[in-house]
Amino acid sequence: MRILGIDPGLLTTGFGVVDSDGHALSYVASGTISTRHLGSGNLPARLKVLFDGIAEIAARYQPDASAVEIIFVNVNPQSTLLLGQARGACVTSLVNSNLSVAEYTALQMKKAVAGHGQAAKAQVQEMVKRLLDLPGLPGADAADALGIAITHAQVGRSMARLAEAAELSKTHAGTYRQGRSR
C-alpha cells in the first residue's frame, strides 16, 4: 500500500510517500510545499498553492491512502485558525483526489516512530532516517510527514491483524458450545 503523509503548515507543508508491504517500509518521496514567496496578507493564494500542490503530489505518486497530522491548539488563537485553514486546504485536496484521510496527533506519530510521545524533532528525523534507510536526515517538515505515513502503515498492519483475528474467531465460534467441543 502506498501512503501519502502530510504535515500541514501555512508557510511550509511537508509531504512524505512510503510503500508498506507487510512488515517492510520503503521510501518513495518527500519534500515540502512552500508559500513563503507569497505575502503574509495573501491567505487565499497560499491556500490555493497548498491545495494545488497536494493535488499534484497525489497525481504524481498515486497513493492508496493518506494521513494528516491533527493540529494542536496554539497559545495564539489566530495562529491556530490560520493553521486550521491550511490543514483544511490539504484535507480537501486529498478528498478531491479520491483518497481516504486518516488523522493522527503529533504525539501518536512520535510514539509510533521514536517510541515516546515527547520525542524532539531531531529524534523523529533520525528515526525516520533509520526506519526508511535514508542516506541522510530528511528536513523537519518532510520527516514529520514521513512519520505520519509510517504511523498509518503501522496502524494499518494492526487493523489487518485484528480483522484476521475477528474472522478466525467467527470460524471457531460455532464449534464450541457450553464449554464442550461438538
UniProtKB/Swiss-Prot annotation:
Q: Which SUPFAM superfamilies match?
A: Ribonuclease H-like
Which Pfam families has this protein been placed in? RuvC
Q: Which residues bind Mg(2+) 2?
A: E69
GO MF terms listed in the record are: crossover junction DNA endonuclease activity; DNA binding; magnesium ion binding
The free-text note explaining how the cofactor binds reads: Binds 2 Mg(2+) ion per subunit.
What is one GO cellular-component annotation here? Holliday junction resolvase complex
> So which cofactors does this thing need?
Mg(2+)
> Which residues does the Swiss-Prot or TrEMBL record annotate as the active site?
D7, E69, D141
What's an example Gene Ontology biological process for this entry? DNA recombination
**Catalytic reaction(s) noted:** Endonucleolytic cleavage at a junction such as a reciprocal single-stranded crossover between two homologous DNA duplexes (Holliday junction)
Keywords, in A-Z order: Cytoplasm, DNA damage, DNA recombination, DNA repair, DNA-binding, Endonuclease, Hydrolase, Magnesium, Metal-binding, Nuclease
Q: Where in the cell is it found?
A: Cytoplasm
Q: Does the keyword Kinase apply?
A: no
The catalytic activity of this protein is classed by the Enzyme Commission as 3.1.21.10
Name the positions where Mg(2+) 1 binds.
D7, D141
Protein family per UniProt: Belongs to the RuvC family.
Q: How does it assemble?
A: Homodimer which binds Holliday junction (HJ) DNA. The HJ becomes 2-fold symmetrical on binding to RuvC with unstacked arms; it has a different conformation from HJ DNA in complex with RuvA. In the full resolvosome a probable DNA-RuvA(4)-RuvB(12)-RuvC(2) complex forms which resolves the HJ.
Functionally, this protein is described as follows: The RuvA-RuvB-RuvC complex processes Holliday junction (HJ) DNA during genetic recombination and DNA repair. Endonuclease that resolves HJ intermediates. Cleaves cruciform DNA by making single-stranded nicks across the HJ at symmetrical positions within the homologous arms, yielding a 5'-phosphate and a 3'-hydroxyl group; requires a central core of homology in the junction. The consensus cleavage sequence is 5'-(A/T)TT(C/G)-3'. Cleavage occurs on the 3'-side of the TT dinucleotide at the point of strand exchange.
Q: Under what name is this protein listed?
A: Crossover junction endodeoxyribonuclease RuvC
Q: Which gene encodes it?
A: ruvC
